[in-house]
Amino acid sequence: DMTLENPLCVLNVMKRHYDRYTPEMVAKVTGMDPDVMMKIWQVYAGTGKPGKAGALLYALGQTQHTYGGQNCRAMSIVQLLLGNIGVPGGGLNAMRGEPNVQGATDVACTVPDLPGYLKWPTAKKHRHLADYLHAETYADGYYSNKPKFMVSFLKEFFGENATVENDYGYEMLPKIGPRLPASAWTTMGTFHMMRDGRIKGYFAWGMNPAHSTPNAKFARNAMANLDWLVCADWFPTETATFWKAPDMDPAKIQTEVYFLPAALIYEKIGSISNSGRWVQWRQQGVLPPGEAKSDFEIIEVLFDRIRSLYQKEGGVYPDPILKANMDYKVDGKYDLRAVCWAINGYTVQDGKLLPGYAQLQADGSTACGMWIYSGYYNNEADKLDPMKQPTARRSKEDPSGMGLFSGWSFAWPANRRVLYNRASCDMKGRPWNPEKVFVEWKGDKWLQYDVGDFVTANPPDNKAFFMTWEQNARLFSYAMADGPMPEHYEPFESPTKNLLNDSVQAPCALFTEDKDNRRGTTQDYPYVCTTYSVTEQWQTGAQTRSIPWLNELISCNFIELSEELAKEKGIKNGDTVRVWNNRGSVKVRAMVTIRMQPMQINGKLTHVVGMPHHFSWAGSFATGDNGNDLTPNVGDPVSFIPEYKAFLVNIEKAA
């Protein structure tokens, strides 16, 4: 409805939905000073006009909630309404908590996706390949090419065993079954199944769930039910030594634990992807010590041994193992370059690397492990030399003058630096900001200073988002499990009621009814706690807590609290304090600061305290109690991320 008058026009639906969100109500819910809040809104809303731009940068403070996905949706809607998507200086930009989180999600270390964000098939909806392609292929937009992406993926996955007669091996691809949803296979879900005896073996690849998992004490108890545990890591982490935790009895734990020394990032070659989707190649700095191996080599050796056992002994259904295309070798040796060829894609007949994903086909003539990366390693003439591939480019020239640096590494897809850059122009192809131009319609063609994120053969129209079937942005989205438009909910544990609707917590939040969450109330736990990082430590501290000079800077865990709360509780800076709730109890040092301040939430004075998540009992130097013993194992229904950022505790000066 171009007149925006129809009551079912999305913009009008949004207006009605958010009528309750008055400035006064928002200030009451959030505890923000109303004048400061209005000033922020006014300044940022000023970016919503031609020649202006505003960027939203966010991190785990927005995502680690039971409504984290909707937080991101809300920011997306703000940026779309202001015209800040696809323009120079705009965007909704994630500040990742790890160097290669982007790469990990790209290659599908998450539950619901295959590599390249192809949906993982479900047994009920996608029984056959035709069912999958019918359900997942868009009628218009670039995902109308999904059959090319999926068939090429299957062709790489099963190689010569993927034929048109067997649907390119689709029947062998594991499906999400009807009995257990995808959430059951997330980090939190797997520990519930460990507790219940449904999972008997566990691999921890460069992760430390005995420390990092929410409600970590619950996770450690669940691990005690395992028959075996394999840890591939740099140091003996809390997970590798979980039976030594202060709250565990080693005599009662029969789990067989195998520790595989893994190579550090500096001790192996490979690519790393940042938040800008730049896939950057890294050379090996030094050889790994002793028996340490890269994750790639460990997986390859393990798979070869497993396949050998299936060949000798058979099994219930050995085909997916025996027919998998897992021979990533060069001259008979495991070689990551062969993985790069598989990811980039190649023609099946002659093995030549593809220039990019535009060459993918749905007839089995091309193979490609991850379509979005196609083109990142495409120099066929020097395919054995990573340093002569697009991913290793290091040009410092920037003809755009806007920080695109298109000759530095490779940005997926197609070396496109800014997604949705068609939105930087009006419907006639004229840039909103003539001084900063990504793309521009001149005469009878598009001039491109960045790779166009649209069908550049077409003249200007109103289609700026060609990864959706309608090729428009979505203010109203049917892709979210918890609703088409963001709505406010309180955390799983909250000091207040929900002032905006009758449901206190997000109704679709995961695991909220699980018996081991042990929800607390303000009657027993009156203070809101949040977790965060410090510059001097890294994640669970496996590496940084083994470096002496870093631990001279931050040597122990602490609770950060306001001067007002410290005075009320008789706590001084440096005191040892006890912090506890229904899930656990920890002793840490007090850090009294003005950074933490009481807030007026729904007219009530509310204290907030904060605690880093880096410390626990294992480590060479700095050790201590684990703050994640207090966090609840509940999560977002879309991203499955835990709610580390808000929960209830009590605090007192330790005896």
Predicted regions and their residues:
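Extended redox/cofactor-interaction regions of prokaryotic respiratory oxidoreductases
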Residues: 1, 13, 28, 80-256, ...
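Long, well-ordered, tryptophan-enriched scaffold segments
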Residues: 1-50, 138, 143, 299
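Flexible glycine/proline-enriched surface loops and loop-helix/loop-strand junctions
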Residues: 7, 21-25, 57-62, 278-288
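Flexible, glycine/charged-enriched surface loops at secondary-structure junctions
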Residues: 51-55, 86-95, 312-321
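Phosphate/diphosphate-binding loops
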Residues: 227, 231-237, 241-243, 287-303, ...
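Glycine/threonine-rich phosphate-binding loop and adjacent beta-strand/alpha-helix elements that clamp
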Residues: 255-288, 592, 613
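Long, C-terminal catalytic modules of enzymes
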Residues: 270, 277-377, 382, 387
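Long, contiguous, secondary-structure-rich segments that constitute the structural scaffold
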Residues: 297-350, 450, 457-460, 477-487, ...
